[in-house]
Amino acid sequence: MAQVQYYGTGRRKHSVARVRLVPGEGRIVINKREMDTYFGLETLKLIVKQPLVLTETLGRYDVLVNVNGGGTTGQAGAIRHGVARALLKADPELRGALKRAGFLTRDPRMKERKKYGLKAARRAPQFSKR
């Protein structure tokens, strides 16, 4: 018998997360490591758990994640987006709650490109009057 799995892909900044929800006891595994060892900051762990807490499905599914690209904040946001999409496939009734919380919306904010003549995207070289 095939095991029931729900897939979701999440993106944030330059990170892409492929998320699988498997009925289980609530373990969250990111790149074959437990979430507690993968993310050091408590805020990042909270970001990942937000859709599960909102929909009250925290202990119902094991979350298996493959994530690459970007930094820790981008990866946490991508995982949150992917978990929300996977939960939607598991139970379409949750769409309203997830949409209101903004978890189904891809965050469009990206790093601004560096411009020539400047040191960074907007940082100008030091101005000398004389």
UniProtKB/Swiss-Prot annotation:
GO terms for molecular function: RNA binding; structural constituent of ribosome. Pfam families: Ribosomal_S9. PROSITE patterns: RIBOSOMAL_S9. InterPro entries: Ribosomal_Su5_D2-typ_SF, Ribosomal_uS9, Ribosomal_uS9_bac/plastid, Ribosomal_uS9_CS, Ribsml_uS5_D2-typ_fold_subgr. NCBIfam families: PRK00132.1. Belongs to the universal ribosomal protein uS9 family. This is Small ribosomal subunit protein uS9. The lineage of its organism: Bacteria, Bacillati, Bacillota, Bacilli, Bacillales.
